[in-house]
């Protein structure tokens, strides 16, 4: 998983397909405490080689892209596929840690930062 350029660059990259624009805000721990694994049911994202999330931190600062490389293991549910609610809005791997400087990093486990991030859009290819 790698961090790349600011969110607005992703609209210029035609190799990515838009999956959804959830605009859902996640707080510390949401990925696991409030979610369920949906990898098996979500074939579009499960079968994608790469998934990209455009996120912003508290108040919309520091837009960041998180790119998740799923080429090595598409069967894994841990750190690859969780949901942020019991509804139908699913996203591939994300617990978010917001660092002290306000930037967002994707992580398998949320750190004890107590901040929140907003997932603005999800792309795949």
Residue ranges and their predicted role:
Residues 1, 60-72:
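Short, surface-exposed terminal/edge motifs of secreted or surface/virion proteins that either
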Residues 1-31:
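Glycine-rich, low-complexity segments
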Residues 21-47, 58-65:
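Surface-exposed ligand/attachment interfaces on beta-rich extracellular proteins
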Residues 49, 98-108:
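Noncatalytic modules at the cell exterior or secretory-pathway interfaces
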Residues 52-62, 125:
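Short, flexible beta-strand-to-coil junctions
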Residues 71-89:
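Terminal beta-strand-rich extracellular "head" domains
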Residues 110-125:
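Short, structured beta-strand segments at or near domain termini in extracellular proteins/domains
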